[in-house]
Regions:
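Nucleic acid-binding interface residues in structured DNA/RNA-binding domains
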Residues: 2-126
Length: 126
């Protein structure tokens, strides 16, 4: 079984069911995003000190599914341009949940799932 994944351990999780310790930096950044604001995966990675790890941020947030946590995952979107970020969850149910959570916080999501970074983007104080 060398090289094979253990099917009883969810992808991205350790055998003990905890996320990899390197992901805690991403979770700390996401926890700082205020209600009604959004950040991009790349922005979270950069603020966590890992500027080329946007995809890892996505894996880390995806690993939260089905767990009890207080991380506001819905506030992290995929960058589409300098002006917009967008919901990037491919699952229609997941993207609908993310949209509803964002709209409940006052974030305007257009028909294409985009959010204005100028209006709703988070600019943290360093």
């Amino acid at each position: 079984m060398v090289g094979k994944r253990n099917p009883t351990v969810p992808r991205g999780m350790t055998r003990k069911g905890a996320p990899p310790s390197g992901w805690s930096a991403y979770y700390r950044v996401v926890a700082r995003i205020p209600r009604g604001r959004i950040a991009t995966y790349g922005q979270v990675a950069m603020l966590a000190g890992k500027p080329r790890a946007a995809r890892q941020v996505g894996y880390a947030l995806s690993a939260l599914r089905g767990t009890r946590h207080r991380i506001p995952w819905q506030r992290v979107l995929g960058a589409r341009s300098r002006a917009f970020a967008a919901i990037s969850i491919l699952d229609p149910m997941g993207s609908a949940v993310q949209r509803a959570l964002l709209e409940a916080e006052g974030v305007v999501v257009d028909d294409r799932g985009r959010v204005s970074l100028e209006r709703f983007g988070w600019a943290p104080r360093r």
